[in-house]
Amino acid sequence: GQLRAEGRRDEAVKLYRELAKDVRTKEGSEAAYYVIESTFGSGDMDKTEKEVFAFSEREPQAYWLAKAFILLGDVYVKKGDNFQARATWQSVADGYSPADDGIVDEAKARIAKLN
């Protein structure tokens, strides 16, 4: 997170890509999520969407997978597809546990903003 905090995004993403080779570990999943978040930040919604689905197929840690799907909902909003965004966030809110680590609240807050 230090490189990210200092605004050295390119260096950070390079490091995250390396760490993200094994997403079965917490660090690998977290790193992969930050790579996806960086793509989202660059404004490429189609690529972000593809990266989320590719990430989901690699058996990542549940917390970071849920974060990625929350971000996917943000992608759908940017693409003007609020219906798909709501469905994505609702599936996270309904299907994710534990309920107390912030993920479910984050999904529900996104849904509330759409109303």
For every predicted segment, state its role.
Residues 1-115:
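Acidic, polar-rich low-complexity tracts and alpha-helical solenoid repeat scaffolds
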